[in-house]
Amino acid sequence: LEKKNPPAILPIQIAYYAGLRIGETCGLTWQDINLEEQCLTIKRSIRYDGIKHKNIIGPTKRKKVRIVDFGDTLTEILKAARKEQLKNRMQYGELYHRNYYKEVHVKNRVYYEYYHLAGTQEVPADYKEISFVCLRPDGSLELPSTLSIVCRSVSKKLEGFEDFHFHQLRHTYT
Protein backbone atom coordinates (compact mmCIF):
# COMPACT_ATOMS: atom_id res chain seq x y z
CA LEU A 1 0.00 0.00 0.00
CA GLU A 2 2.83 2.36 0.86
CA LYS A 3 4.36 1.90 -2.61
CA LYS A 4 1.13 1.82 -4.64
CA ASN A 5 -0.94 4.56 -2.99
CA PRO A 6 0.80 6.38 -0.09
CA PRO A 7 -1.97 9.03 0.28
CA ALA A 8 -4.41 6.24 1.22
CA ILE A 9 -2.40 5.32 4.31
CA LEU A 10 -3.33 8.37 6.44
CA PRO A 11 -7.12 7.99 6.07
CA ILE A 12 -6.84 4.26 6.78
CA GLN A 13 -4.81 4.99 9.92
CA ILE A 14 -7.30 7.63 11.08
CA ALA A 15 -10.24 5.27 10.54
CA TYR A 16 -8.40 2.45 12.32
CA TYR A 17 -7.46 4.51 15.38
CA ALA A 18 -10.63 6.64 15.60
CA GLY A 19 -13.38 4.43 14.10
CA LEU A 20 -14.59 6.91 11.47
CA ARG A 21 -16.65 6.23 8.38
CA ILE A 22 -14.98 6.72 5.00
CA GLY A 23 -16.75 10.03 4.23
CA GLU A 24 -16.12 11.36 7.75
CA THR A 25 -12.42 10.54 7.46
CA CYS A 26 -12.14 12.41 4.16
CA GLY A 27 -14.19 15.33 5.53
CA LEU A 28 -11.92 15.86 8.53
CA THR A 29 -10.20 19.27 8.67
CA TRP A 30 -7.24 20.42 10.73
CA GLN A 31 -9.63 22.69 12.66
CA ASP A 32 -11.51 19.53 13.78
CA ILE A 33 -8.41 18.11 15.47
CA ASN A 34 -7.22 18.97 18.96
CA LEU A 35 -3.81 17.35 19.38
CA GLU A 36 -3.43 18.62 22.96
CA GLU A 37 -6.71 17.06 24.13
CA GLN A 38 -6.33 14.14 21.68
CA CYS A 39 -9.82 14.38 20.22
CA LEU A 40 -11.52 14.86 16.85
CA THR A 41 -14.77 16.73 16.23
CA ILE A 42 -16.73 14.91 13.54
CA LYS A 43 -19.17 17.27 11.84
CA ARG A 44 -19.08 16.62 8.09
CA SER A 45 -18.81 13.89 5.52
CA ILE A 46 -17.78 13.78 1.85
CA ARG A 47 -19.79 11.80 -0.68
CA TYR A 48 -20.07 11.62 -4.44
CA ASP A 49 -23.40 12.74 -5.90
CA GLY A 50 -23.88 10.75 -9.10
CA ILE A 51 -26.72 12.98 -10.32
CA LYS A 52 -24.74 16.21 -9.95
CA HIS A 53 -21.43 14.49 -10.83
CA LYS A 54 -19.79 16.31 -7.93
CA ASN A 55 -18.29 15.54 -4.55
CA ILE A 56 -20.53 17.01 -1.87
CA ILE A 57 -19.62 18.10 1.65
CA GLY A 58 -22.54 17.33 3.92
CA PRO A 59 -23.50 16.24 7.42
CA THR A 60 -22.48 12.94 8.97
CA LYS A 61 -24.69 9.88 8.50
CA ARG A 62 -26.72 10.59 11.66
CA LYS A 63 -26.51 14.38 11.12
CA LYS A 64 -24.97 14.83 14.57
CA VAL A 65 -21.66 16.33 15.64
CA ARG A 66 -19.64 14.00 17.84
CA ILE A 67 -16.31 14.03 19.64
CA VAL A 68 -13.94 11.07 19.25
CA ASP A 69 -10.95 10.55 21.52
CA PHE A 70 -7.69 9.07 20.25
CA GLY A 71 -4.31 8.10 21.67
CA ASP A 72 -0.63 8.85 21.33
CA THR A 73 -0.13 6.74 18.20
CA LEU A 74 -2.63 8.73 16.14
CA THR A 75 -1.30 11.98 17.63
CA GLU A 76 2.16 11.19 16.25
CA ILE A 77 0.72 10.10 12.88
CA LEU A 78 -1.22 13.38 12.57
CA LYS A 79 1.79 15.52 13.55
CA ALA A 80 3.90 13.76 10.91
CA ALA A 81 1.14 14.18 8.30
CA ARG A 82 0.89 17.92 8.98
CA LYS A 83 4.65 18.29 8.64
CA GLU A 84 4.60 16.31 5.36
CA GLN A 85 1.80 18.50 3.97
CA LEU A 86 3.72 21.68 4.74
CA LYS A 87 6.78 20.21 3.03
CA ASN A 88 4.68 19.25 -0.03
CA ARG A 89 3.21 22.75 -0.17
CA MET A 90 6.72 24.19 -0.37
CA GLN A 91 7.88 21.64 -2.96
CA TYR A 92 4.87 22.05 -5.26
CA GLY A 93 4.84 25.82 -4.93
CA GLU A 94 2.15 27.45 -7.08
CA LEU A 95 1.12 24.03 -8.44
CA TYR A 96 0.00 22.93 -4.97
CA HIS A 97 -3.78 22.56 -4.87
CA ARG A 98 -6.00 24.36 -2.41
CA ASN A 99 -9.36 22.93 -1.41
CA TYR A 100 -12.60 24.88 -1.51
CA TYR A 101 -16.31 24.50 -1.04
CA LYS A 102 -19.12 26.45 -2.61
CA GLU A 103 -22.52 26.87 -1.00
CA VAL A 104 -25.33 25.92 -3.38
CA HIS A 105 -29.04 26.66 -2.83
CA VAL A 106 -31.61 24.53 -4.65
CA LYS A 107 -35.32 24.43 -3.78
CA ASN A 108 -34.95 25.63 -0.17
CA ARG A 109 -32.06 23.22 0.40
CA VAL A 110 -28.40 24.04 0.94
CA TYR A 111 -25.46 21.82 0.10
CA TYR A 112 -21.74 22.34 -0.42
CA GLU A 113 -19.79 21.35 -3.53
CA TYR A 114 -16.10 20.47 -3.25
CA TYR A 115 -13.48 21.96 -5.59
CA HIS A 116 -9.69 22.06 -5.70
CA LEU A 117 -7.59 24.58 -7.61
CA ALA A 118 -3.87 24.94 -8.20
CA GLY A 119 -2.25 28.12 -6.91
CA THR A 120 -2.06 29.41 -10.48
CA GLN A 121 -5.85 29.31 -10.93
CA GLU A 122 -8.13 32.21 -10.08
CA VAL A 123 -10.43 31.51 -7.14
CA PRO A 124 -14.08 32.45 -7.73
CA ALA A 125 -15.50 34.89 -5.18
CA ASP A 126 -18.06 32.38 -3.86
CA TYR A 127 -15.43 29.70 -3.03
CA LYS A 128 -14.37 29.31 0.60
CA GLU A 129 -11.09 27.58 1.45
CA ILE A 130 -11.16 24.46 3.64
CA SER A 131 -8.15 22.75 5.23
CA PHE A 132 -8.65 18.98 4.87
CA VAL A 133 -6.42 16.47 6.66
CA CYS A 134 -6.38 13.64 4.11
CA LEU A 135 -4.56 15.08 1.13
CA ARG A 136 -2.67 13.77 -1.86
CA PRO A 137 0.91 15.08 -2.25
CA ASP A 138 -0.34 17.81 -4.64
CA GLY A 139 -2.73 19.12 -1.96
CA SER A 140 -5.98 17.80 -3.44
CA LEU A 141 -8.35 15.82 -1.24
CA GLU A 142 -8.06 12.04 -0.95
CA LEU A 143 -11.63 11.10 -1.93
CA PRO A 144 -13.79 8.25 -0.59
CA SER A 145 -14.04 6.75 -4.08
CA THR A 146 -10.25 6.40 -4.28
CA LEU A 147 -10.11 4.80 -0.84
CA SER A 148 -12.81 2.32 -1.82
CA ILE A 149 -10.78 1.33 -4.88
CA VAL A 150 -7.63 0.92 -2.76
CA CYS A 151 -9.49 -1.30 -0.27
CA ARG A 152 -10.95 -3.39 -3.10
CA SER A 153 -7.46 -3.80 -4.54
CA VAL A 154 -6.07 -4.86 -1.13
CA SER A 155 -8.87 -7.41 -0.71
CA LYS A 156 -8.00 -9.00 -4.07
CA LYS A 157 -4.23 -9.03 -3.66
CA LEU A 158 -3.54 -9.80 0.00
CA GLU A 159 -4.23 -13.16 1.51
CA GLY A 160 -6.33 -12.85 4.64
CA PHE A 161 -7.95 -9.60 3.43
CA GLU A 162 -10.57 -11.14 1.14
CA ASP A 163 -13.82 -9.13 1.33
CA PHE A 164 -12.03 -6.26 3.12
CA HIS A 165 -13.92 -2.95 3.10
CA PHE A 166 -12.96 0.42 4.57
CA HIS A 167 -16.03 0.29 6.85
CA GLN A 168 -14.52 -2.66 8.71
CA LEU A 169 -11.96 -0.26 10.19
CA ARG A 170 -14.78 1.24 12.30
CA HIS A 171 -14.91 -1.97 14.29
CA THR A 172 -11.27 -1.69 15.40
CA TYR A 173 -12.04 1.36 17.55
CA THR A 174 -13.51 0.84 21.02
Predicted feature locations:
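DNA breakage-rejoining catalytic core of tyrosine-based enzymes
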Residues: L1-E2, E37, K43, D49-G71
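Short, basic (Lys/Arg/His-rich) helix/loop patches that form interaction surfaces
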Residues: L1-I9, A18, V68, Q85-E94, ...
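Basic, Lys/Arg- and aromatic-enriched nucleic-acid-binding interface segment
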Residues: L1-L28, E36, R47, K64-V65, ...
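Residue-level signal for well-ordered alpha-helical positions
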Residues: L28, A81-E84
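Phosphate-binding active sites in nucleotide-utilizing proteins
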Residues: D32
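Generic beta-structure capping elements
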Residues: K43-S45, T73, P137, L169
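Active-site/binding-pocket entry motifs
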Residues: I46-Y48, T75-E76, E84, S140
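Mixed-charge, low-complexity intrinsically disordered segments
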Residues: Y48-N55, G93-Q121
